[in-house]
Curated annotation (Swiss-Prot):
Catalysed reaction, written as an equation: L-histidinol phosphate + 2-oxoglutarate = 3-(imidazol-4-yl)-2-oxopropyl phosphate + L-glutamate
Record-annotated disulphide pairs: none
N6-(pyridoxal phosphate)lysine found at: 207
UniProt name for this protein: Histidinol-phosphate aminotransferase
Enzyme Commission (EC) number: 2.6.1.9
GO molecular function, one term: pyridoxal phosphate binding
Family: Belongs to the class-II pyridoxal-phosphate-dependent aminotransferase family. Histidinol-phosphate aminotransferase subfamily.
Subunit structure: Homodimer.
Length: 350
């Protein structure tokens, strides 16, 4: 018998997590360098007896650490179980079922999923032929805007003055700026918080802070926005961040010098790798992230993807996404790893 009322949902397709050992994993934009020594120490010294109790409701220690680091009052932060948790709540808090929200046609795939799930109408705005966000496309009537900056999967960064132009022209709706990759060479939109109360910024600990397996993220916004999204949080899952995540996230923020150093290494390797690929004919989009989106030379994206995988090198291929089906997204690992990737590519070209 048919069961009534079941939702038809097209889910987000996450990158694979191979169980093999001795691989080079460059398909989900993780950080190859690992957490700081302070995080290791915080994990080793965590009192497991604390786990008998629920976690804190407001993650005071982590919010204070972030406030000290970024110079934003503690009451303008909300902590989540990864930035996906924050973004999901933001869709519920800031958008409605009457007005279309807008976001790029090539961006984080979850935006479309959340819009469908929460029955929020949306319009995907095509990137330019050079895969950039055209400011003029966002100076139109809408019910909200979501921009990933730098963007994914392109890696392209939109300068802050252009982002501000979009924010300034849309002060009657919320503009979400997903800064998952901001610490790989971009300029943060945090200064806009002092000028506009419709800006909501999200960040994750999964990329720069090497804590993808922990699931910690946060949002930053005006008191007006925080009141609404906190109401959503407390209506859905008040205890959304576990005690270990708060302790280790706090340790990461308090040891941020370590992460600045490894981000600098990743950026240097990214720029070197991009130049080397261009030298052998690849088209490489300019990146301010911990990955590059490349169009191979001499072989198809599918052929290169299969060859790399046969050598236990995992990258991301988007065969069903028409505009980038001829490209691969390659996360930036250590210098040694990327040298091995380059050698493997050259082997196929030979």
């Amino acid at each position: 018998m048919e069961i009534k009322g079941l939702r038809k949902i097209e889910p987000y397709v996450a990158g694979s997590q191979p169980a093999e050992k001795n691989i080079i994993k460059l398909n989900t934009n993780e950080n190859a360098y690992g957490p700081s020594p302070a995080v290791h120490q915080a994990l080793a010294s965590f009192d497991a007896h604390q786990l008998r109790k629920y976690s804190t409701l407001d993650q005071t220690a982590l919010r204070q650490a972030l406030s000290d680091q970024l110079g934003v009052p503690t009451d303008q932060f909300i902590i989540g179980n990864g930035s996906d948790d924050i973004l999901s709540m933001a869709f519920l808090a800031f958008f409605n079922s009457e007005e279309k929200i807008i976001f790029p046609d090539l961006t984080y795939g979850f935006y479309k999923v959340w819009a469908d799930l929460y029955r929020i109408p949306f319009r995907e705005v095509p990137l330019t032929s050079s895969f950039e966000i055209d400011t003029q496309d966002y100076l139109v009537e809408n019910g909200g805007i979501i921009l990933t900056n730098p963007n994914a999967p392109t890696g392209i960064y939109k300068p802050l003055d252009q982002v501000e132009e979009i924010v300034k022209a849309n002060q009657s709706v919320v503009v979400i700026i997903d800064e998952s990759y901001i610490n790989f060479g971009g300029e943060t939109a945090l200064p806009l918080l002092e000028k506009y109360d419709n800006v909501f910024i999200t960040r994750t600990f999964s990329k720069d802070a090497s804590l993808a397996g922990l699931r910690v993220g946060y949002g930053i916004g005006s008191p007006k926005l925080m009141a609404v999204i906190n109401a959503v949080k407390n209506s859905v899952n008040p205890y959304n961040v576990d005690s270990i995540a708060e302790a280790l996230g706090t340790a990461a923020v308090r040891s941020w010098d370590y992460y600045e150093d490894i981000c600098a290494k990743i950026m240097a390797t990214r720029d070197w790798f991009s130049q080397e690929l261009q030298a052998i004919g690849f088209d490489v989009l300019p990146s301010k992230t911990n990955f590059v989106l490349v169009k191979p030379y001499g072989v198809t994206a599918g052929q290169l993807f299969a060859y790399l995988q046969s050598k236990k090198i995992y990258v991301r291929y988007f065969p069903k996404v028409e505009r980038i089906s001829d490209r691969l997204r390659i996360s930036i690992g250590t210098q040694d790893e990327m040298e091995r990737v380059l050698m493997t590519i050259q082997e196929l070209q030979a």
